[in-house]
UniProtKB/Swiss-Prot annotation:
Family matches, as PANTHER family: RIBOSOME MATURATION FACTOR RIMM
Compartment annotation: Cytoplasm
InterPro entries assigned to the protein according to its UniProt record, in alphabetical order: PRC_barrel-like_sf, PRC_RimM, RimM, RimM_N, RimM_N_sf, Transl_B-barrel_sf
Gene Ontology biological process terms from the UniProt entry: ribosomal small subunit biogenesis; rRNA processing
Entry domain remark: The PRC barrel domain binds ribosomal protein uS19.
Name of the protein: Ribosome maturation factor RimM
Organism taxonomic ancestry: Bacteria, Bacillati, Actinomycetota, Actinomycetes, Pseudonocardiales
HAMAP family tied to this protein: Ribosome_mat_RimM
Subunit structure, as described in the record: Binds ribosomal protein uS19.
Pfam families assigned to the protein according to its UniProt record, in alphabetical order: PRC_RimM (PF24986), RimM (PF01782)
Length: 180
């Protein structure tokens, strides 16, 4: 018997309740929110500190201030919504659409990759891909355990080699310098 769990990927995080009817403010972590958060969509939900996932069925979703307001089936009222604060909303990796674009990546493909400067010296490891309204950032954990946020744009990230497990970054001067 195979006990291996499928790889799950976060497509959103519940930030907080909104209003008194149980709506949830969701920070989106997917390029396809209209697909992932369509009414009737069933996502996995892992509450803070929990190891097991439970089902989260979207009843409705609408954009709000760079995030989504989501109503979930079975979540009625602010108290029920408050219990979900901080939960991750997930899909399994096999639910993701493959892309034919060589410059398009899923977060899980980048997280854990070695980060090097153009001359080859180590810069760190990609700890997380951070999604913001202004664009994506690579959170790079440096060898001295600092976190540096690198804008995920071709000028600063000129090369990604998934097979070699490596990303080349060419940041502006001072970005990786330790604070004095």
């Amino acid at each position: 018997m195979d006990d291996k769990q499928p790889l799950t990927l976060a497509v959103g995080r519940i930030v907080r309740p909104h209003g008194v009817r149980g709506e949830l403010v969701v920070e989106v972590r997917t390029d396809s929110p209209e697909l992932r958060f369509a009414p009737g969509s069933v996502l996995g939900m892992r509450r803070r500190g929990a190891h097991a996932s439970e089902n989260f069925t979207v009843a409705a979703a609408r954009p709000h201030a760079g995030r989504l307001l989501v109503r979930a089936e079975g979540v009625e009222g602010r108290e029920a919504a408050e219990e979900l604060r901080g939960a991750l909303l997930t899909v399994t990796a096999d639910e993701l659409e493959s892309t034919d674009d060589p410059d398009e990546f899923h977060d899980h493909q980048l997280e854990g990759l070695r980060v090097v400067f153009p001359a080859g010296e180590e810069a760190g490891v990609v700890a997380e891909v951070v999604h913001t309204p202004a664009g994506e950032l690579l959170a790079v954990r440096t060898p001295d355990d600092r976190e540096v946020l690198v804008p995920f744009v071709s000028e600063m990230v000129p090369e990604i080699d998934l097979e070699a497990g490596r990303i080349v970054v060419d940041p502006p001067e001072g970005l990786f310098d330790a604070e004095e």
